[in-house]
From Swiss-Prot:
The keyword Ribonucleoprotein does not apply. The keyword 4Fe-4S does not apply. Is necessary for biosynthesis of the 4-methyl-5-(beta-hydroxyethyl)thiazol component from which thiamine is formed. This is Thiamine biosynthesis protein X. It comes from Corynebacterium glutamicum (strain ATCC 13032 / DSM 20300 / JCM 1318 / BCRC 11384 / CCUG 27702 / LMG 3730 / NBRC 12168 / NCIMB 10025 / NRRL B-2784 / 534). Keywords: Cell membrane, Lipoprotein, Membrane, Palmitate, Signal, Thiamine biosynthesis. It is a lipid-anchor.
């Protein structure tokens, strides 16, 4: 059993590395940001998605899912290289997820979204799971998780300073990379 878990863990790490996109290291900038929160709830009925926001950002609904997942992102106006926090609730503690800043437009023919950051660099992308070796964030029994990432504005073929991007939670390789929840984010001017 131990060998199969190790092999599965290695395969899972390889799948994660292949799934997440690479980019140039972010440029560090020190500037204060006013913190705000945004919430998007996604449920089985995609027309019931709602958003509460202290900014004027609009929201899009994700594909229908079984969970009622909420993401609270702070700050809402991201600065490349600074910390961003995802407070996530409604997750299945037995499930597996990724959290990252991603393109708001899906990749045609590919379930894996284009996200910012470097491949397998868990400073800009997180893997949430209680059962997978190598996961970077555990999910509490009540379905909550806190993810702290470095806000990264660019990825392969993605520039969130000029393209619409979202803070996204999506299923890991065991969940088919399905969309779970997302909330629009913007990067503050440098």
């Amino acid at each position: 059993m131990s060998i199969s878990r190790t092999v599965f863990g290695i395969a899972a790490t390889a799948a994660l590395s292949a799934a997440l996109v690479a980019c140039s290291p972010p440029h560090q900038q020190d500037s204060p940001v006013q913190r705000t929160n945004e919430i998007l709830t996604t449920s089985q009925n995609p027309t019931s998605a709602s958003s509460t926001s202290t900014s004027s950002a609009t929201t899009t609904s994700s594909a229908p899912v079984e969970e009622d997942v909420e993401i609270v992102v702070s700050p809402a106006a991201l600065v490349d290289g600074e910390q961003v926090t995802f407070e996530i609730s409604g997750l299945d503690p037995e499930g597996g997820y990724y959290a990252a800043i991603c393109d708001s437009v899906a990749n045609p023919g590919n379930p894996v979204p284009s996200c910012t950051g470097e491949m397998a660099d868990f400073t800009s992308q997180a893997w949430l799971s209680n059962s997978q070796p190598g996961a970077t964030v555990e999910i509490a029994e009540d379905g909550t998780a806190t993810v702290e990432l470095e806000a990264t504005a660019t990825g392969t073929g993605l520039d969130c300073t000029t393209q619409a991007c979202v803070a996204k939670v999506f299923g890991d390789h065991t969940e088919g990379f399905r969309d779970v929840a997302e909330v629009p984010v913007t990067f503050a001017a440098a």
